[in-house]
Every structure is written in structure tokens, then in C-alpha cells.
Amino acid sequence: MNWSRLASAVVGLLISASCALGQASLSDMASRIDLSDADRAEITKQVDRYTAMIATGTPANVRDGREALTKPFEADKVTVPFRVEAGRQLVEALKPLTTSSNELVAVNTLRIAGEVATTNSMALLIDGLKDPRPPVRMGAAYALTRLFAQARRSAPAISAGDTASALKALETFIAAERDARLIDTAISAMVLAAKAPGGIAAPDRMARAIVEKARGKGAEADTLTITSRAVREMRDVLIGSDGKAPPGTARAAAEVAGQLIVAIKSQLTTADKEALITAAGSAETTLTIASTTLAGPDIAAMKLALADKVRAADQDGLSKQAERVLAVLKSEPFNIK
């Protein structure tokens, strides 16, 4: 055995290890309030390394690059200074990749931008919602759910104005989108936005966006599916508020519940019966809670029994109850047109 060569190898390993120990990882930096020039240089180095891996388009490289760049944002306490600095560098490097002809690259790049959760990274996601490719639009919508989840779990690096811009973009997205799965993801993003800066009315805006979608002529999306999802979310918002939801939220919940009843009535003989029964129950429960919140009519006393009407395939009975509900929604305290 060549002991000289072995000794040299050991020394080399020790030197490499000592360098690595002296060099902070991105995850180590994530909790720092003050970033040094060396920290910024290391961020640059790792951003360049992993974005280059993603750019190759090789599935394994894309996965490894994405995981390396999102891992720092999984820390319990990601500071705003780190998020802003890492975000600044990442957005610059990621921007050309978000429009890559390789959908795998574009989607994973948007996912990273969502975890970064800054003003600049949000702009990439809003642009992604307009991409002509459905998988990329889905990636952008999902990344917005991650962005708002990040804003909830640590000090947010987005403003109320940023949230407003995202909500407007999601409303536009819902109005134009034909795929119910993508709309469902947009609903998730808008619900999560409620806890972001300036996002308190996000669920209301989501509900009204779905109502407008359902009322639209020639809407290709599955109206029953998306309206049912919106009603469940608004029901949960009302329940979570313990009777103290803002009046606007209660009205929006009632409006989308009324729209769901219209959808159920129109699809009574064509849609899956179990799905209709579940939707009818959600609509009636949501109306009841909304009216109670607004000190409105006693919905329970109306004995709507919507689910029973659906179960019995009672078209006439369901139509009559739907008319009663719509009449209530047009009067005080709802005043829905």
C-alpha cells in the first residue's frame, strides 16, 4: 500500500470537510436576520448551481435542483431578510425558466417561486397563470397555494397590495379557465390567501368569482363540481368564525350556496346522485349558518330537505324549494340580485 498517497488523500478529505464546515448552507442562513457578504455570495453560488441543474431538463436533475432550492424555506423560522435576498437572486435566475418549452422545467421553477413567497416571485406566478399550457397554469395556481401557505407560517415578505394583485389575477383566471381541476386549485389558493396580509376578504372574492363563473354563458367548466367545492370552503369559513364572520362573508357564502342549488336543480337527472345529495346538504347547511350569522330568516324552519328531494329525484319539489331559497336571498338581510 502506498502510505504516502493514502495520507495525501486523508489530508485532502480533511481540508474539504473543514471548508464545508466553514461554509453555511442555505438552510443554515434561513433563520439569519443579518446576512454577510459571504452569505450573499454563497446564495449566488448555490442558486447558479441548482438552477443550472434544473435547466438541463433531466427529470432527476430537475427534482434534485428543486428540492435543494426549496429546502431552506421549509425551516420553522425563515426570516424576511433571507427570503428577500434569496428571492431576489432566485427570481432573476428562475424567470427565463418559467417559460421554458420543457413543461417539467417550467412547472418546477414555478413551484420554487411559490416557496420563495416574495413580491417578485409572486409576479412570476401571476404570469404563469396566463401560460397557454394547462400543466403550467396548474403549476402556477398550485405554487400560489404554496406562496400563501408560506406567508401564513412565517413572517410574510409580501404586502397587502401583493395579495390584492394575486386575488385579482386568480379571479381573472377562474373566469377564463375551462378545466375544473385548475379552478379547484385556484379556489385553494384564494382560501389560503385569507391569512395573508390584506387577505381577509379572499374567501368572499373566491365565492363571488365562482358565482360569476357558474352564471356565465357558455362556461365549459364543471359548474356543479367547482360550485360545490366553493360552498364547502365557505361553510368551513363560517364554522371557523364561530358565528362572527363579517357580513360580507356570510352574504357571499349564501350567494354561492344559492348558486349551487340552481346547479343541482339543473343537473338532477344527469349528474351523479350521491354527489348531488352531498352538495345539497352542504348548500342547505351553509345557507343556515349564513342566515344565522346575519340574524336573517330561520332556514331550518323552512324545512327545505334538499337532500331528500334529490334522493327522491323530485324535480318539482326541488324546483319549488329552490324558488323559495332564491326569494329569501333577494330580500333582507342578503339583498342578492
Identify the role of each PLM range:
Residues 1-10:
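Bacterial N-terminal signal peptides that target proteins for export
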Residues 9-18:
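Bacterial N-terminal signal peptides
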Residues 32-52, 78-98, 118-129, 150-174, ...:
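Amphipathic alpha-helical scaffolding segments comprising HEAT/armadillo-like alpha-solenoid repeats
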Residues 56-60, 96-104, 129-135, 173-181, ...:
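Short coil turns that connect the paired helices of HEAT/ARM alpha-solenoid repeats
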Residues 196-337:
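Long internal repeat-built scaffold domains in very large eukaryotic proteins
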